[in-house]
Amino acid sequence: MSYSIGIDFGTASGRVILADTSNGHIISRYEEDYANGTYMNSLYDKPLPENYFLQNADDYLQILEQGVQFVLEDSKVNKNDVVGIGVDFTSSTIIFLDEQFEPLHRHEDLKTNPHAYVKLWKHHGAQDEANYMIQMSKNKNWLDYYGSSVNSEWMIPKILEVKHEAPEILRRARYIMEAGDYITSILTNSNIRSNCGIGFKGFWDNEAGFNYDFFHSVDPDLPKIVKEKCEAPIISIGESAGRLCKDYQQIWGLSQDVQVSPFIIDAHSGVLGVGAIEAGEFTAVIGTSTCHLMLDSRQVPISSITGSVKNAIIPGLYAYEAGQPAVGDLFEYSKNQAPKHIVDQANEHHMHVLNYLEELASHIRIEEQHVVVLDWLNGNRSILSNSHLTGSIFGLTLQTPYEMIHRAYIEATAFGTKLIMKQFEDNHIPVHTVYASGGIPQKSKLLVEIYANVLNKRVVVIDSSNASALGAAMLGANVGNAYSTLKEAALSMKQPIAYIQEPEIQKVQAYKPLYHKYCELHDLLGRQYPELSYLI
């Protein structure tokens, strides 16, 4: 009998699980919101610019230390049977550290400087830098495997943002890294990087390394910044990042033989958690945002897909990523905008407002739907890569019920996913099955039904809201030698299927006109006249 620990750092909270390596059974689970939350309106009573999303790294250490201690004590397992630890983290979430590996926001003279704090993945303060990087790559092949685009959420635009907005932070930072790398570096007492994070978010290639020609064309100082502050030994997924350091061995009472995996991006970890590890399997990790992932034996340039990296999920295969930056957040927004009579009716029925809205929306026939939404309330990641775009609602009349608008929000996220899927299929990477992971698909059968009919694909819903944490535990099991390959770990430890939603041919046909309208509006306001969206 052996066990592994999976540590999952999400957008607003962290989870730690202890799993049985033989079957993936979760023996103990810890979850806690980040104590300081997310700074998005103000910091120390000073207003923050729009699209700022900052966090405090101390919250991550609290989750790490308290969470691991809790699952070990709660499970009452023999601590000597714990063989490995895996970590997943939202990305690109960037942290700036001093010589002693301390976050700069701990410095008394920097605690009111927003750029000293962790820049959460959905921090969009670097859009101008991203746009400039795209401009400088014109007529070059530098971005072929990044969908010919640069996203403001990625590491390099955020570094440039700090260089332009707070150069003193850049001068005082000795290390700049993904927050996931920060955690694994602390666990192993070493300065290391994961190929998953640095490959997808830092323009690093497993054969060519960093693209310094590209960096120099953007800013002559950038190559030096990356070499001095970002370069470190890079460990691939499936390899060990090293043994757990002595300090944490003593704190938790674990063996000196416990191995630590390099961090994996949280959505990518979800692919492992659901067991979607073969070519042709399309995984949508649906949470506050949605990350779409596929594996293939080939690397081909795909326009508007946000990256492809070898060995980033399964050794030997290329992982492809795309995404939508507001899905669960969009539904939460819709709930908060619900009129009073909807809220009152939900309370009368003793139902959560979101559940009640979905109940009402489920009775709307597709042919009756006359509202189309552009779901860009947090910008657009794929396929337009423009965080300045804003959301729009079309087709409203004085008779439009609110539940029709809510249904249109759900449909818009499905239409956006279909556009992303089309990019893969147009480039000869076929999609056979869609896996829906995350907490939302389990809670919303309406969403799963809409996705199956819009995509015209079978949608497999996995019986686990802990797919990312379980994927991290699989990595821990693999590097801890419970399995000889990561594929074996994923197949043995994956969670069971909750249910399968097949597309219904009549509904598939009924959605085609709505999808066509969505595409027309998408291209009109996203490509031809984006400035109209900026004004809304």
UniProtKB/Swiss-Prot annotation:
From which residue to which does the signal peptide run? none
Catalyzed reaction equations: D-ribulose + ATP = D-ribulose 5-phosphate + ADP + H(+); L-ribulose + ATP = L-ribulose 5-phosphate + ADP + H(+)
- Please, one GO biological process term? L-arabinose catabolic process to xylulose 5-phosphate
Q: Which domain of life is it from?
A: Bacteria
Report the pathway entry: Carbohydrate degradation; L-arabinose degradation via L-ribulose; D-xylulose 5-phosphate from L-arabinose (bacterial route): step 2/3
What is any Pfam family matched here? FGGY_N
This protein's GO CC annotations: cytoplasm
Q: Which SUPFAM superfamilies match?
A: Actin-like ATPase domain
Give the UniProt family note. Belongs to the ribulokinase family.
Q: What is this protein called?
A: Ribulokinase
- Taxonomic lineage from the root: Bacteria, Bacillati, Bacillota, Bacilli, Bacillales
- Annotated gene: araB
